[in-house]
Structures are given as structure tokens and as C-alpha cells.
Amino acid sequence: SLSTKDKETVKAFWSKVSGKTEDIGNDALSRMLVVYPQTKIYFSHWKELTPGSAPVRKHGMTVMKGVGDAVSKIEDLTAGLTELSELHAFTLRVDPGNFKILSHNILVVFAIMFPNDFTPQVHVSMDKFLAALSRALSEKYR
């Protein structure tokens, strides 16, 4: 679980990166679709799935807005993300294993884009936060 220190670290790091969420989301989603091509099945209705394409960029921004929303609800992610969990479980039917894949790609992009700020402590706290976020999004699958 997230310690008080982890929560403080996540909030502080988010305040540094939140102005770049469109680029972070685009790169993370682009990487996921290339490195884990099986994830493309969820986006087969898009006209273009190439890295940086308009649909990828738009959905990457949507994802990162969701992450930002989760940061603001860090004290109770499960309750705070009920609606998003229901959407992914019942409407979109996304395999919850994909949350872990996307989380990994978000961490990779953080490391690339913010090498000085993405310290080992930030890495640990963000990894724990994204894992908690993934668990909260998976809540309605049970």
C-alpha cells in the first residue's frame, strides 16, 4: 500500500509532470501498442494506430487525465475510480492485465522525459501508485 511518504512523492512528482501529460500519454500509449501489439485489439475501431497518430495522442491524453484524477483521489482510489472501473470492466471489457502493461510504459516515459526528477524514490512511489491505480480499476472485475 501507499505510505504517507509515497503519496507526498506522487503528488510532488505529478505537479512537475502534469504540464506534459499529452506528450507522456502519447508516448506511453504509442510504446504499448508497438511493444505489446496484442493490446491493439481494444482499439481496432480506430482508423490509425501508428505511434503519434491523432487517435493515439487523443486517447493518451485521456489516460493521463485519468491518472491525474487518480492523483487527486489518492486517499481512496477504489471509491474514487468506481465509474472508471465500471467502464473498463463492463463496457470496454479491457483485460485488467493491460493496466499493468500501460503502467510500465508510463514509467518508461517518465524516466525518459524527466531523468533528473525520476529518482529511484520517485520510481518506487510512482510504481506503487500505478499498481494501486491498476488494482482500483480492476475492482469491478471481481
Curated annotation (Swiss-Prot):
Belongs to the globin family. Red blood cells. Gene3D superfamilies: Globins. Involved in oxygen transport from gills to the various peripheral tissues. The modification N-acetylserine is found at residue 1. Residues 1-142 form the Globin domain. The lineage of its organism: Eukaryota, Metazoa, Chordata, Craniata, Vertebrata. Heme b binds at residue 88. The gene is hba2. Hb2 is a heterotetramer of two alpha-2 chains and two beta chains. The keyword Hydrolase does not apply. One of its GO terms (molecular function) is organic acid binding. This is Hemoglobin subunit alpha-2. It comes from Trematomus newnesi. Pfam families: Globin (PF00042).
